[in-house]
C-alpha cells in the first residue's frame, strides 16, 4: 500500500506513475482507502484544506510513486435552458440550496438528485440524467 501525503506540483521522472479516478465527493476527502486504476492499494492522508482536482498529482513521502487524479464518471444531472437568463436563474436557485455545481456557458451539471430534478423541471428547464465526470466549482474562499 502506498500512503499519499502531499501534492506534487512537478512530475518526478524516476517515480512509478499511477492513476486514480475519484468522484467529486471523494476528491474532497483528506483520508481515504482506495485503489489506483491499475489496482494498487492507496491511502490518502492529505493535509487540511486540500480539494483534489483532475490533473493534480499526489506523491508518497519517499517520492517512489506519483498518482495523477482523474474525475471518475458518476450519476449527474445536466440542466439546460431555453435562454441564458433561465440558466442563470437555475444557478441562483441551486446556489441558494448549496448544491455543488459545475457551470458551463450553455448548461449546468450537478449530482443526481430526484428532488432537485423535479424542482428544475417545474421551472421549465430541461434536465437529463448522465453518467459523466463531475467537477463542481470550488467556492469563493478556497485556497488550493
Curated annotation (Swiss-Prot):
GO biological process, one term: protein-containing complex assembly
Species: Thermosynechococcus vestitus (strain NIES-2133 / IAM M-273 / BP-1)
Family to which the UniProt record says this protein belongs: Belongs to the UreE family.
UniProt xrefs under InterPro entries: UreE, UreE_C_dom, UreE_N, UreE_N_sf
Pfam family, one: UreE_N
Protein name: Urease accessory protein UreE
Keyword Cytoplasm: yes
Key words of the record: Chaperone, Cytoplasm, Nickel, Nickel insertion
GO MF entries: nickel cation binding; unfolded protein binding
SUPFAM superfamilies in alphabetical order: Urease metallochaperone UreE, C-terminal domain, Urease metallochaperone UreE, N-terminal domain
The keyword Thylakoid is assigned to this record: no
SMART domains: UreE_N
Main location: cytoplasm
Cellular component terms per the entry's GO annotation: cytoplasm
Subcellular location: Cytoplasm
Function statement: Involved in urease metallocenter assembly. Binds nickel. Probably functions as a nickel donor during metallocenter assembly.
